[in-house]
Amino acid sequence: MTSGTEQATLNTEENGSDSDHLSKEPIAMPALDWDGPTDSNNPRNFSTPKKVFITACLASLVCISTFGSSVMSPASGQLIHEFGISKELSILATALYVLGFAVGPLLFGPASEVLGRKYPLSVGVFLFAIFSIPIAVAKNVATIFVCRFLCGTFAAAPLAIAGGGLADLWEPLSRGIAVAGFASATFLGPVLGPLVGGFVTKSHLGWRWTQWLSIIFSLVFLAIYFVFCPETYSPIVLARLAKKRGQMPPGGKVDFKQLAKVYMLRPFIMLVQEPILALLTLYMGFIYGFLYLCFEAFPIAFEEHRGWDIGIGSLPFLSITVGVLIGVVIIIVHTMTRMRRKLETVGDAPEERLVPMMIGSILMPAGIFWFAWTSNTSLPWAPQVVSGVFIGCGILLIFLQGMNYIIDVYKVMANSAISINAMFRGLLGAGFPLFASYMFDNLGVPWAMSLLGFLCVALVPVPFLFFIYGERIRKWSKFTAH
């Protein structure tokens, strides 16, 4: 069975890269295979309810890790009052966590290739919970900032690993639907964080309970995942089965030097040499940074300018949530109709992934400009809140389909492409909130958001460019499977 062998053999060489040792996967596992196409041990052959359950568990852990990134954003005022720090310094509680998202994939990506999905993911979530405890009882801001960075680093484990877990379980067409639902959790987490954090911070519980809630949620869902979900990474599953049966052939060996080269060097080479990866990483990084900037911009617009309290002021984030869910529906409909027909007739159609992304590239700046020019306090609040639906839908469509396109284009090289993409996103996600207050204070909400809208408009051509010329560009690359 060819597909089983391809999944189990991680030292595959890519087309056009024979002379490039960095194109080889770093783990020389023995060539093992399943006992036929219906082998029940193959994660692809799990029952649909079992696949859905595992997917839901992975989505829950991703949601919790991203929820933790923004849940403290409404606590800036209390941090300023309690520790006597500036507003700009208080934003580091969010920025350092997101910076950890840039570092974590460099650790957990290689770990998932050597140890499988389950144990690195579980260790990461557990350590995230452990390092949240010092924040909840912190007596100084240094403890908060250091531990927030560590929390973000370990919380990156689900972000770095869960996508691979979905690829283990689902065939390409079904995976498109599973990933769409999964992606909603990725974005619902950071959007719901300020909503929950706002009401918790405002209540008698105070800001420290934002951390206790994160700890409780993460440990409960981690326990469910660890107890009920099996390992899904085929090479590891096959190796364990062979060892159990006494059939493990010699040659299973990890080359840690090559592992370091592949994960530390190849992603940067790809970013420089691959126009598809470079432009999509720039676009997705901007979108990610803008999302985290919203956690500072929305309170300025609704709490400072319209005079809403911290709890009510977090409710407009629900409009982004609605937009995210609409985006999920759009992707599912596209996958089951146009994408399905394309796969049936052509067999491989990466550029078809860009159709929803093109829609999102129009919706996103439209929502930003709408938000900007309905922010005047003399206007009703409702139109400004509704703009969040277009922003949320645009964010989801651009980000998710950009990620799907990268995976389809680079295939087994996708881990390297995604790791550099995640690192760049994390840097922008951490950086954007830091200049938000300066920009909005100096330019005002209308022009600050309009500036971001113009930058977003400048990136609109990206999906259209690759939809038209993507196939031709892929033929130039030594990292893609043409």
UniProtKB/Swiss-Prot annotation:
Matches recorded under Pfam families = MFS_1
SUPFAM superfamilies membership: MFS general substrate transporter (SSF103473)
Q: What happens when the gene is disrupted?
A: Does not result in significant changes in sencondary metabolites production.
* One cellular component term from this protein's GO annotations in UniProt: plasma membrane
Region (Disordered) location: 1-22
Q: Which UniProt keywords apply?
A: Glycoprotein, Membrane, Transmembrane, Transmembrane helix, Transport
Q: Which domain of life is it from?
A: Eukaryota
Positions bearing carbohydrate: 15, 45, 376
Can the keyword Iron-sulfur be found in this entry's annotation? no
- Topologically, how does it sit relative to the membrane? Multi-pass membrane protein
Gene3D superfamilies linked: MFS general substrate transporter like domains
TM annotation in the entry = 52-72, 89-109, 125-145, 149-169, 176-196, 209-229, 275-295, 312-332, 354-374, 379-399, 427-447, 448-468
Q: Which subcellular locations apply to this protein?
A: Membrane
| UniProt keyword Glycoprotein, yes or no | yes
- Chain's role: MFS-type transporter; part of the tra gene cluster that produces terrestric acid. The clavatol biosynthesis cluster cla and the terrestric acid cluster tra are both involved in the production of peniphenones and penilactones.
Family that this chain belongs to: Belongs to the major facilitator superfamily. CAR1 family.
- What is the protein name stated in its UniProt record? MFS-type transporter traF
Native species: Penicillium crustosum (Blue mold fungus)
